[in-house]
Amino acid sequence: MKNGHTTRQKVPAGRYALLDELRGLDLVSMMLYHACWDMMFLFGIWMDWYAGMPGRLWQQTICWVFILLSGFCAPFGRHMLRRGVTVFAAGALVTAVTLVFMPGGRVIFGVLTFLGTAMLLTGVLEPLLKKVMPAVGLAVSAVLFAVCYPVGLGWVGLGGWKLMLPQSLYANYFTAFFGFYPDWFYSADYFGLLPWLFLFWAGYYLHKAVGRRRMELLRRPVCPALGWMGRHSLLLYLLHQPVIYGVLSAAAVLFA
């Protein structure tokens, strides 16, 4: 409010404001989730609900929306490979920083590493992906995501069908990158290529199935503040954990 008149934040030309706002909302949810994680595992404040199914559902909701939306937005722009390199490098930075300063909360193959890899693979394979009808690609990607979802438990399957995978697949860091992590593997944030690449591709094909003409309704902003966060999600993601940790550390000293 300035001089009695309200001002609205401008949405950059060409942006689909509601997509930015959805990403911003998911980012806020993720920040709150990570704040709870820090309180539990770094500051010893136990929360039964967070350790149980409600916390699990919250975490899955955040990552499903984030990855599906990233896949949906992948066809925007003409520099998917460049974006993939940038996001992958940001993931490598997170890994390096956590290994040095927070080895107990280290992040190996986290969401940024995954998203960067998914963008690079999609950019390379896009000539082939474009040959698949969007509705078919969406359906196949969704089914493959469901089939591969339990890969971390040692099997794949759907409904009554279940195929146990050989334990030799779950061998080392290399196999963990693809989704087959051994028992000794630990990461505070982990997304292997399987099953999450198929969720990313489901978003990619959902974009193609919807079409740009039907997306015009998404240009109208509802909450510009969330839109700003969505447009700067990579920077905010890199900064949020140090800020949250600093705030919680200060609170611990003040209220000790």
Task: Set out the residue ranges of the language-model regions.
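Alpha-helical transmembrane segments and their immediate juxtamembrane cytosolic regions
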Residues: 1-256
